[in-house]
Amino acid sequence: MQNIHFIGIGGIGISALARFLKEKGFKISGSDLKESKITKELEKEGVKVSIPHHKDNILNKDLVIYSAAIKEENPEFKHAKELGIKCLSRKEALPLILEDKRVFAVAGAHGKSTTSSILASLLDDASVIIGAILKEFGSNMIYKESQNLVFEADESDSSFLNSNPYLAIVTNAEAEHLDHYGNEVSKLHHAYAEFLDTAKIRVINAEDEFLKNYKNESTKLYPSKDIKNCTMRIENFKPFTSFELKDLGEFKVFGMGYHLALDASLAILAALNFLDIETIRTRLKNYQGIKKRFDILYADENLVLIDDYGHHPTEIKATLSAAQEYAKLGGYKKITAIFEPHRYTRLAANLKEFAKAFESIDELVILPVYAAGEEPIELDLKAVFPKALFVEDIKREGRFLVASKGQVFEEGLIIGFGAGDISNKLRQKDE
């Protein structure tokens, strides 16, 4: 089996799998609805990418792997089935992709990309497959001739149960993506327990409401007791967080916020199974962050523009706390958040929590909901966010942002939140 075709290859997670299999020696092709930065990069790397989907794209393929967004009526999926070509969902393909690796898997509702990327910096001999772009490598995949592989495991479709972890980290088990679990929290928690039980080494945030009751042997982080003297500073506009962990001394990591110290601590405790503490302390300094996580796009004395993937109230609240600290340290007098809600179901289920998450900032701008394929839900957002400015669009013009109504945002700390298209709106074309 040599020719593998990915339907939906432009996705951040599926593109990492395609890159990994290409490095393993398979001939990779793919397709997507529209061209993107990821599809352009894949083409430069030698992957044949077809835009848009067309039934002829799967001719002469041995295997088709499709993303979670692909429906049965997709022309490529339908034609592959008609021709008898084996078709696997991303979830079903994981055992094939990870089969010969010792997998260090990171799961959790929040913080898994950051934790897995920090772990990748510490275990620098390991291959890496994550759902974010590692800034020090410029990719969501690193291939090494190694048995070890750092993998960001996804609970949203229970695919983390197919990752066969040697080491499992769970950052938290907050209820997200409940639709996949029949809207039953107990089923989600059972899946997390099954994921942990599979691993030989387990590292957990033991102050999480569910994880604190996990009975099997594990390395437990109690953040309120184990993380001390957490301080933040800015060096040439770059954010850094320092903290002490248990009796292991002080650590310094790129990025800002207590939540970053928590994620780094989980990665450190996992890495201690394989490395000495001084090696960990040194390698942690190599970490340069990931794209779309407190990602500083522009900074001077009057303006800092930040892009963040946060799309759940818990994430937004934690990141805004870090943003307030950055603004204080940098002398920025005003904080503006630009929010592109992601999925109607998530917004409807967490309206009060979203309103509370944004209540501490000076100015809130709300873009239309990024539906991600969902049917619209009628919501009175103006009643929930009475002080917000609602705009149809926003775009980057030089250093500044300009809204569709003509408002210009040009000073203070400006931070965009969302998992949809907002990142493209905040960036220059070449970023």
Curated annotation (Swiss-Prot):
<keyword id="KW-0573">Peptidoglycan synthesis</keyword>
<keyword id="KW-0133">Cell shape</keyword>
<keyword id="KW-0067">ATP-binding</keyword>
<dbReference type="GO" id="GO:0008763">
    <property type="term" value="F:UDP-N-acetylmuramate-L-alanine ligase activity"/>
</dbReference>
<feature type="binding site">
    <location>
        <begin position="108"/>
        <end position="114"/>
    </location>
    <ligand>
        <name>ATP</name>
    </ligand>
</feature>
<dbReference type="Pfam" id="PF02875">
    <property type="entry name" value="Mur_ligase_C"/>
</dbReference>
<keyword id="KW-0132">Cell division</keyword>
<keyword id="KW-0961">Cell wall biogenesis/degradation</keyword>
<comment type="function">
    <text>Cell wall formation.</text>
</comment>
<comment type="pathway">
    <text>Cell wall biogenesis; peptidoglycan biosynthesis.</text>
</comment>
<dbReference type="GO" id="GO:0008360">
    <property type="term" value="P:regulation of cell shape"/>
</dbReference>
<dbReference type="InterPro" id="IPR036615">
    <property type="entry name" value="Mur_ligase_C_dom_sf"/>
</dbReference>
<dbReference type="GO" id="GO:0051301">
    <property type="term" value="P:cell division"/>
</dbReference>
<dbReference type="InterPro" id="IPR005758">
    <property type="entry name" value="UDP-N-AcMur_Ala_ligase_MurC"/>
</dbReference>
<dbReference type="InterPro" id="IPR050061">
    <property type="entry name" value="MurCDEF_pg_biosynth"/>
</dbReference>
<dbReference type="InterPro" id="IPR013221">
    <property type="entry name" value="Mur_ligase_cen"/>
</dbReference>
<protein>
    <recommendedName>
        <fullName>UDP-N-acetylmuramate--L-alanine ligase</fullName>
        <ecNumber>6.3.2.8</ecNumber>
    </recommendedName>
</protein>
<dbReference type="InterPro" id="IPR004101">
    <property type="entry name" value="Mur_ligase_C"/>
</dbReference>
<comment type="similarity">
    <text>Belongs to the MurCDEF family.</text>
</comment>
<keyword id="KW-0547">Nucleotide-binding</keyword>
<dbReference type="InterPro" id="IPR000713">
    <property type="entry name" value="Mur_ligase_N"/>
</dbReference>
<keyword id="KW-0131">Cell cycle</keyword>
<dbReference type="GO" id="GO:0005737">
    <property type="term" value="C:cytoplasm"/>
</dbReference>
<dbReference type="GO" id="GO:0071555">
    <property type="term" value="P:cell wall organization"/>
</dbReference>
<dbReference type="Pfam" id="PF01225">
    <property type="entry name" value="Mur_ligase"/>
</dbReference>
<dbReference type="GO" id="GO:0005524">
    <property type="term" value="F:ATP binding"/>
</dbReference>
<keyword id="KW-0963">Cytoplasm</keyword>
<dbReference type="Pfam" id="PF08245">
    <property type="entry name" value="Mur_ligase_M"/>
</dbReference>
<dbReference type="GO" id="GO:0009252">
    <property type="term" value="P:peptidoglycan biosynthetic process"/>
</dbReference>
<dbReference type="InterPro" id="IPR036565">
    <property type="entry name" value="Mur-like_cat_sf"/>
</dbReference>
<keyword id="KW-0436">Ligase</keyword>
